[in-house]
Amino acid sequence: METVRSAPPGDGAAEALLKELERQVQDVVRASSWWERHGVDCAILALSLLALPAGFLCLRAHNILAFATGITILGVCHYTLTVKGSHLATHSALTESKRWSKILMIFFLEVCTAFSAEFAKFNHVNLHHVYTNVVGLGDSSTWKVPLLNRYVYMFLGPLLVPIITPLVALEHLRKEEPRTALRTLGFICLGLYSQYWLFMNVSGFKNPSSALACMLLTRSLLAHPYLHVNIFQHIGLPMFSPDKKPRRIHMMTLGVLNLPRQLVLDWAFGHSLISCHVEHHLFPWLSDHMCLKVKPLVSKFLHEKQLPYNEDSYLARFQLFLSRYEEFMVHVPPITELVGVQ
């Protein structure tokens, strides 16, 4: 068991700190326009949808540069819709309407991502966010595959994500109500077949195997950073016992890490998954743009209150995981106990 010796504030002080930070963030949100709160991210998602025809048409050209451009457009747009769009929709961060939030969640998760909306929301919002880095609940253990060695997992494993995603969804459908399962299955099939149809009829592929290969290629374009980001920002940080989990502000500041800004990943994954992950875990209802806007405030507040604000580079985390792969991804993590908090 690991012990944090410099004890953070106790329960009462922790609640007061969180309320003070929430008040400051709410003041920023109230002073922000609709464009800042939702419009910027909605515009990015809309542009990604509008760019899809150009990507499919580029693949018609018998030119390697045009083909590469088409694959890049389709790949980046795919991840923008399936990662950024799905993530924001799951947190109802794209609109304040409950009805539209539900519609957008189904569209981005089931049609675009080929995954179950209900299953994703339960695992991400109800488990991962509520029990961040709590062993057996929100500890990101679903990303661990102990059977794979470090090189296979870090370099080849990501290529399996587009194949595994719909298979996991189909496996889960057996536990859903028949009506929900049929809806999810229908939308997953619609999304996959629509992309296949577009490759065959708009891009002009002559045989199904070529279309399927391009589907896999575009869905794998950013699979490596997608997998890496999901493990870098939680695994290797303090883990907590379910019966001794710390107060929320300690859980989120100790167990979450920000990566530096990176143009492509910021666009495709969103600020809340890259450079503002701490802010996102503290305020999951904020859009990507709002997470970026409150980042200086949150960083300053946590530093002033002598609370952790974890930051590291992508390369540093990559090297760390390669060198300590068994410790992080195979063995049971040590439990961190905060002295003076529980």
Swiss-Prot record:
Pfam families, A to Z: FA_desaturase
GO MF terms, alphabetically ordered: oxidoreductase activity
Segments carrying motif Histidine box-2: 124-128
UniProtKB keywords: Fatty acid biosynthesis, Fatty acid metabolism, Lipid biosynthesis, Lipid metabolism, Membrane, Oxidoreductase, Transmembrane, Transmembrane helix
Biological process (GO), any one: fatty acid biosynthetic process
Motif segment (Histidine box-3): 277-281
Chief site of localization: membrane
InterPro entries listed in its UniProt record: FA_desaturase_dom, Fatty_acid_desaturase
Domain of life: Eukaryota
Gene Ontology CC terms: membrane
Membrane topology: Multi-pass membrane protein
Compartments, record wording: Membrane
Extent of motif Histidine box-1: 87-91
Pathway: Lipid metabolism; fatty acid metabolism
Transmembrane residue ranges: 39-59, 63-83, 100-120, 151-171, 185-205
EC number annotated for this UniProt entry: 1.14.19.-
Family stated for the protein in its record: Belongs to the fatty acid desaturase type 1 family.
PANTHER family according to UniProt: FATTY ACID DESATURASE 2, FATTY ACID DESATURASE 6
Protein name: Fatty acid desaturase 6
